[in-house]
């Protein structure tokens, strides 16, 4: 007998999988990712790791792009980012 409130364990919903710990998911995957950060002054794009532990500076104008505060990184006001595709 199948109830409507049952969850299919082989095909769980994506929302449910995102809330689980990275090792408890059906297919293990990391929470970290690389992202492209655009500088607010010179519009130069820099690739940054989401969990990096150092301050990231712009290569051309030396302004601070991100500061380490845990996850997610704190971007400087005015900077924009996008997640890099696999």
Swiss-Prot record:
One of its GO terms (biological process) is translation. A zinc finger (C4-type) spans 39-61. Keywords: Metal-binding, Ribonucleoprotein, Ribosomal protein, Zinc, Zinc-finger. GO terms for cellular component: ribonucleoprotein complex; ribosome. Coiled coil: none annotated. Binds 1 zinc ion per subunit. The keyword Cytoplasm does not apply. It comes from the Eukaryota. Belongs to the eukaryotic ribosomal protein eS27 family. This is Small ribosomal subunit protein eS27. It comes from Chlamydomonas reinhardtii (Chlamydomonas smithii). The lineage of its organism: Eukaryota, Viridiplantae, Chlorophyta, core chlorophytes, Chlorophyceae. The gene is RPS27.
